[in-house]
Amino acid sequence: MSDDNSVTKVAAFYQFAALPDYRELREPLRAFCAGLALKGSVLLAQEGINGTIAGAPDAIDAFAHELAHGTMFGGRLDNLELKFSTAEAMPFGRLKVRLKKEIVTLGDAAADPTRQVGTYVDAAAWNALIAAPDTLVLDTRNAFEVAMGTFEGAVDPGIKSFGQFKDFAAERLDPAKHRRIAMFCTGGIRCEKASAHLLARGFAEVYHLKGGILKYLEEVPEAQSRWRGECFVFDERVALGHGLRERDKDATRDQ
């Protein structure tokens, strides 16, 4: 049975995968999304795909099926990281499908997640990892995102863009001192690329939260959670809490 199509369903997705024909994929993907009346933003690059889109539940399900199993990508997105949530209203004004040099910009050619990444840790195992005294817990997001919410004991790199993460790592992280690093981000893409960067620099034990904060908030009960605050999202919902609940907009206006 299909979902209630009166609800707006949101899909956040990414995968690092070799897409040498990414330029040729732009128009077919745009046309497919437009035909389903989807809105949002999709990035295509030689290293993969990254995006967040919204629409009717049936349309989102058709989109997800095409990416993972359809002919457009020919099975190359068979390990797609995909997270679903809902919105009270359409959180995007239009559809954008753009070509990029990177699907998340770090600016380090040696950081290639299609070749090597850190160890994935699912939401259920995350609490134990970050509670260990010899684990450095590292938030890879921008400072304004960290200010809205983060995990207990996490280090804030104080960066304004993800491209500055490599400078933070060069100045503040030492493979000899920081033997175990656990990183996280909104949906998993930034910390996955950051893990590739640290491995290329000689860090041996690097972990990252599979599915990111959003998957953690979806799966871990609030009573067991080590997350504090809200998770910023790059759409009109602004921020999500435990259970992926939208921020109370009326309460926000009253502040």
UniProtKB/Swiss-Prot annotation:
Gene3D superfamilies in alphabetical order: 3.30.70.100, Rhodanese-like domain
Superkingdom assignment: Bacteria
Rhodanese domain span: 131-225
EC assignment: 1.14.-.-
Record's catalysed reaction(s): uridine(34) in tRNA + AH2 + O2 = 5-hydroxyuridine(34) in tRNA + A + H2O
Keywords recorded for this protein, A-Z: Oxidoreductase, tRNA processing
Role played: Catalyzes oxygen-dependent 5-hydroxyuridine (ho5U) modification at position 34 in tRNAs.
The name this protein goes by in its record: tRNA uridine(34) hydroxylase
Organism of provenance: Bradyrhizobium diazoefficiens (strain JCM 10833 / BCRC 13528 / IAM 13628 / NBRC 14792 / USDA 110)
Gene name per UniProt: trhO
